[in-house]
Every structure is written in C-alpha cells, then in structure tokens.
Amino acid sequence: MKPKIDYSIYLVTDRDLMSTETLEEAVEKAIIGGCTLIQLREKDCSSLDFYNTAVRVKEITDKHNIPLIINDRVDIALAVDAAGVHVGQSDIPAAIVRKVIGNDKILGVSTGSVNEALEAEKNGADYLGVGAMYSTGTKKDADSTSMNELRKIRENVSIPIVVIGGINKDRVKDFKGIGIDGLAIVSAIIAKEDITTAAKELKNEFIKI
C-alpha cells in the first residue's frame, strides 16, 4: 500500500554541501528539526556507493518513520525498498518508471511548465517538483520557473506540488496563497551549521502560508 506523505519540508541531499561529518548525521538532524520527507540525491558516485549510502540513510529514516525517496535510480529505490523514486525530465520517462515500481511506491517528477506537469500527472506521478523557482548553485543548468507558471500548474493539476530551487526561509512567504504542498530544500538546510534549527525555521515559515 502506498504510504501517505507529508511533503511540507522535503530535504534533498547533497554531500558536497553538508556541514556534518556524515550524510546520516545531516539527515537525522534535519528530521529532528522537522523534515517530513528525505530525497537521497547522489550524482557522482558508483552504484555500489549509492546503494550503501541508501542503506545507511534508510536506517535513519526508518528509525524516525520518515519516507525515503531515491533520486533517479529506480534500481536503488527497489533494492533498499525506499518509499519511492524521483525523476527529472531527462531521466527514464515517468510512465516507464511507474510500470517498474508498481502502484505501491511514490513517484515524483521534476517539472517546469504546465505541459510537463500535465504529462507527469497523466503518466502516474504522485507529486511534482516544480522549479527552479530561483537561481541555485546546486543545479546550475536548471531552467527557471516563474510564479505565474507555478500558479498555472497549480490550477491545472490535482496532485501535490513541492517547489524547489534557491528557496530559503526569507523566500517562503513568496508562495503564500498559491496552494503548494511543500518546500524541497537543499542548501538552506544541509549546508547550514545548525541543520536542526534551519529545518525548524523553514517549517515555521511554511506554516504561515
């Protein structure tokens, strides 16, 4: 059965930015601060390293009853029995991913336009990651998405939307009244010296919108 997901504060990992010794430590601190969902994103490591990292991170997420999503790698997601997988526009098509993972896993898709959003929803996405909303150092090649486009996406799809890309605690208020379901955060949590406090502050800002 597909898990019920709270998308509100969604940490996307980046080992190059983390302020802690280990990724597991960063993830646990973020969860203690209020992160409700974790995505393990590893772009520059071997399959074995990714798998081993996923096993260790899943021990932390399982301990706190927080779902783990794997970025891009359907095989890793299935191997560690993660809650689901997240794919981008240049990854395996969402419809194929859905066939592989079945109906009991969560499928997230990165989108930046209404057309991409509608296509993702049609192909079985459970949620959309919309952005990049602002310029970001973590994905320098990411196309930007306007607030107007975000509103159009919200009006045209019924599945949950999380926004991503350059979001920090001071920008959360920009999304007031749009109807987003969560914030996908990288550096504004994982790069902070005090990860737990950073997550708490973002959660407090999200509650206001």
Curated annotation (Swiss-Prot):
It catalyses: 2-[(2R,5Z)-2-carboxy-4-methylthiazol-5(2H)-ylidene]ethyl phosphate + 4-amino-2-methyl-5-(diphosphooxymethyl)pyrimidine + 2 H(+) = thiamine phosphate + CO2 + diphosphate; 2-(2-carboxy-4-methylthiazol-5-yl)ethyl phosphate + 4-amino-2-methyl-5-(diphosphooxymethyl)pyrimidine + 2 H(+) = thiamine phosphate + CO2 + diphosphate; 4-methyl-5-(2-phosphooxyethyl)-thiazole + 4-amino-2-methyl-5-(diphosphooxymethyl)pyrimidine + H(+) = thiamine phosphate + diphosphate. Keywords: Magnesium, Metal-binding, Thiamine biosynthesis, Transferase. SUPFAM superfamilies: Thiamin phosphate synthase (SSF51391). Its cofactor is Mg(2+). Gene3D superfamilies: Aldolase class I. Mg(2+) binds at D72, D91. Pathway: Cofactor biosynthesis; thiamine diphosphate biosynthesis; thiamine phosphate from 4-amino-2-methyl-5-diphosphomethylpyrimidine and 4-methyl-5-(2-phosphoethyl)-thiazole: step 1/1. The keyword Metal-binding applies. Binds 1 Mg(2+) ion per subunit. GO terms for biological process: thiamine biosynthetic process; thiamine diphosphate biosynthetic process. 4-amino-2-methyl-5-(diphosphooxymethyl)pyrimidine binds at Q39, L40, R41, E42, K43, N71, S110, K139. GO terms for molecular function: magnesium ion binding; thiamine-phosphate diphosphorylase activity. GO terms for cellular component: cytoplasm. Its EC number is 2.5.1.3. 2-[(2R,5Z)-2-carboxy-4-methylthiazol-5(2H)-ylidene]ethyl phosphate binds at T136, G137, T138, G166, V186, S187. It is an enzyme of class 2 (transferase). NCBIfam families: thiE. Condenses 4-methyl-5-(beta-hydroxyethyl)thiazole monophosphate (THZ-P) and 2-methyl-4-amino-5-hydroxymethyl pyrimidine pyrophosphate (HMP-PP) to form thiamine monophosphate (TMP). Belongs to the thiamine-phosphate synthase family. This is Thiamine-phosphate synthase.
